[in-house]
Regions:
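Alpha-helical oligomerization segments
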Residues: 146-168
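Terminal low-complexity "docking" segments
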Residues: 1-136, 140-149, 153
Length: 168
């Protein structure tokens, strides 16, 4: 992996970690955020490219909404929700879709800043490998984030001690 990609990955992971921590403080009862954050920490330990691939897998099909700050990205409209259910989305995976309508303008702008910053870093990562988009789509379309976490929970893949350690 070349040095510039390594820097993008490090910055992406640092920014996503910061964003997730802020969102968990803002929405302490949203279990989806905590689950996403736990999965982020585990996957980052295994391979630091996985978090950016998961994020981009949940955002690629919504690039226009992200770039234009289109609130449909956070909407719960039936057509949007049906579209998300095929491959999932970052806002659904984290539960942010449930809070969007009740947030202040300042909070919405701060969230957009993070979402767009992470997306730009994701594009920088993808643009270095022409086959990366296809790889991300193949993985993301085969199993959604929620299905992955459900499988892990149902099969007791992680010990309670391990879960407690990564949730610290």
């Amino acid at each position: 992996m070349n040095n510039s990609i390594g820097k993008v990955l490090d910055e992406f992971n640092k920014t996503l970690d910061e964003f997730m921590n802020k969102m968990i403080l803002q929405f302490p009862f949203e279990n989806k955020l905590k689950t996403y954050y736990s999965a982020f920490k585990v996957t980052k330990m295994c391979d630091k490219t996985i978090p950016i691939k998961i994020y981009m897998g949940g955002c690629l099909q919504f690039s226009d909404q992200i770039k234009n700050r289109d609130t449909e990205f956070f909407a719960k409209r039936k057509t949007f929700v049906n579209r998300m259910s095929v491959a999932s989305s970052f806002t659904d995976d984290t539960g942010l879709v449930n809070y969007w309508d009740n947030l202040s303008v300042n909070s919405k702008n701060a969230i957009w800043d993070y979402v767009q910053t992470l997306f730009v870093m994701g594009e920088m990562f993808i643009n270095k490998d022409s086959g990366m988009i296809q790889k991300i789509n193949n993985v993301y379309n085969n199993i959604s984030f929620n299905e992955s976490m459900k499988t892990l929970n149902e099969n007791n893949t992680f010990t309670e001690e391990f879960i407690n350690k990564i949730n610290k």
